[in-house]
């Protein structure tokens, strides 16, 4: 476990999971910088316990992203295009994500946590004519690039997200969990726990709602 406060850069800081993550990290004495595209969201993320940083990661090159990342101890990618045109999905969920990995490496920030989705990978099985295909394909490429990097990465892959109250209980694919659903609050808790566990570098955490406390379930996951 990490025994000291970290400086965590959360990309996609106004997303639903990120907004639940920031207060968890702040409560654990970590300093959170929330990257947001819309300056009107600054008050929200400040209320979450994070320091807002306005930047459009979709438009930034690796050099600019390196400046953004530098000075932090960890990066959390929780950004996404949120549907819409496939071209933008690829621009954000694949291209910008990959540039952020390159930036983290250039900035000397080794710890990198990617929020992906349960089932991502070459065998995602989404047909090309499905509206979800662009996202599945973009995530497959981005996740593979992260796994091939020399960063201390962890892939967090929740199943279908809900706004139900968090329970603090999950089940991972390690114990046979199939795709189901999980509250966003529990996803945020998993990310917070993963950040504090260097031993989960190189691990893929696929999970949904279950019966085992998050901390206990993650104890059994190895990188």
Regions found by a protein language model. Give the residues of each.
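N-terminal Rossmann NAD(P)H-binding glycine-rich loop of SDR-like oxidoreductase domains
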Residues: 6-30
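Conserved Rossmann-fold NAD(P)-dependent oxidoreductase catalytic core, especially the SDR/UDP-sugar
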Residues: 31-35, 39, 81-91, 95-148, ...
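NAD(P)H-binding glycine-rich loop region in Rossmannoid oxidoreductase-like domains
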Residues: 34-99, 103-106, 195-199
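Substrate-positioning beta->alpha
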Residues: 97, 138, 156, 178-193, ...
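Flexible, glycine-rich beta-alpha linker
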Residues: 122, 154-175, 207
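Glycine/proline-rich active-site loop of Rossmann-fold NAD(P)-dependent oxidoreductases
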Residues: 124, 165-170, 194-203
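Core catalytic loop region at the nicotinamide-binding pocket of NAD(P)H-dependent oxidoreductases
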Residues: 194-218
